[in-house]
Amino acid sequence: VSLRRLLFLGLGHLSNGDVSIAADFARQLAPDRFAVGFVTPAATAPYVQATGLAAYPLESRDPAHNLEAFDRLVADFRPDLLVAADAFTLDYSAAWSGLSMSLLRQRYDIALASFDQYDYPAADYLVDFYGGHRTRFPRLLDLCDLQIRNSPLNRPAPGEPGVIVTRMVCGGSSPLPVSRRRQDRPTVFLTNSRWEYVNVVRSPAMTQLMRAIPRIIHNHLAALNRPLRVVHVGPARWEFPVAPRIDYRYAPRLAPAEFHARLAGADLFVTGNAVSVTLTQAVLAGVPSLLLDNHKLLDVALLARNGSAPAWLTQAAPQLTIAYPFRVYPWGWHDFLTPVLSDNPYVDCFLSAGVFERRRVLRAMTELLDDATVRARLAERQAALLHRLHRLPPAGDALDAAKLAGR
């Protein structure tokens, strides 16, 4: 039987999230049945190679040169299927990569697929950004012969025709422990990506939020009033004084295996991103996790004028005057993600609290660190989710059933 040949395109500059989901899928494909390659920006190639996959970086800043290089690669690699790690990210890359979804569709007689992390059709491609700005994205997934939805972010259930739903493996799964593994100071894991520092709608309110949330998370952790170790991986370290009982360890980046080991060894993972790939890794690895989001408009300036603003909030984030709903810090996506997260067993496998609701946040952090009953309940939900994930077909079988290669 000849190998099926898949060429993945992960062309984002601001995050490894899209590429990590595609790489997770690709690593599940048996090498005696599938040949796999990844087209990436030059800076992303080492990340892909560290996962054990072949990378073909586009080295030029000139889109014409990159298109020529891709033409040569297609001729040499002879793919049966081109797979966008994210169709929208691929289109954004056109200015430097020379590639777009419509170009791939028109230029090559090769089946075309894309991952759909967020179920864009269910949201009718309408994306709401922090502060209320809404954009209808182009229906790029309609160009595809196949859509691939990663679970558990997408519900672990079979997809409609033209859609496959496959489970993420990440670094593997472990049961969530009912009690903490160690008796010394707990380790809290935090991570950020470069896109979290991009004000995508040039909104003053988003700028305020970008400055406020790291300080607010630090303030919540300090208010636990106990020794903690905070491991923070991301492009920028905290730029404010750290509370004396917090041992703050910062790294700009870690290799994928070390990143997963640090995450899996943590006692608590905290994120402001409901669709964080690291949150999926944490849930599968049995790491107690907390999502900090916001579901209501908070006029902090008005509360301050009335003397009713929480003292801790004005101390932690004095420049914050107003806060809007968000599920993904700092971009918003509150309404956009409602369909994919509704009736989804994944969201029951971690705790959520409104980031501005002090008592709820501190209670959730304390329960995740110390409360065996809460941890046992999460462990049961995680086990049930894993059972449903394992009932999904393996990636290779799902691709075979789609019967797309060599169309």
Q: Where are the regions a protein language model picked out?
A:
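Nucleotide-activated donor-dependent transferases that construct or modify glycoconjugates
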Residues: 2-14, 189-197
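Active-site and donor-binding regions of nucleotide-sugar-utilizing enzymes
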Residues: 7-28, 37-158
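Conserved catalytic-core segment of nucleotide-activated headgroup transferases in glycan assembly
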Residues: 18-21, 25, 172-239
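Catalytic donor nucleotide-activated moiety binding site of glycosyltransferases and closely related
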Residues: 39-54, 116, 127-130, 212-256
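Donor nucleotide-activated moiety binding/catalytic core segment of transferases
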Residues: 66-69, 234-285, 289-290, 294-295
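A nucleotide-sugar donor-handling region in carbohydrate enzymes
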Residues: 124, 132-196
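Catalytic binding pocket for nucleotide-activated donors in carbohydrate/polymer assembly enzymes
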Residues: 277-376
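C-terminal alpha-helical cap of glycosyltransferases
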Residues: 357-373, 388-407
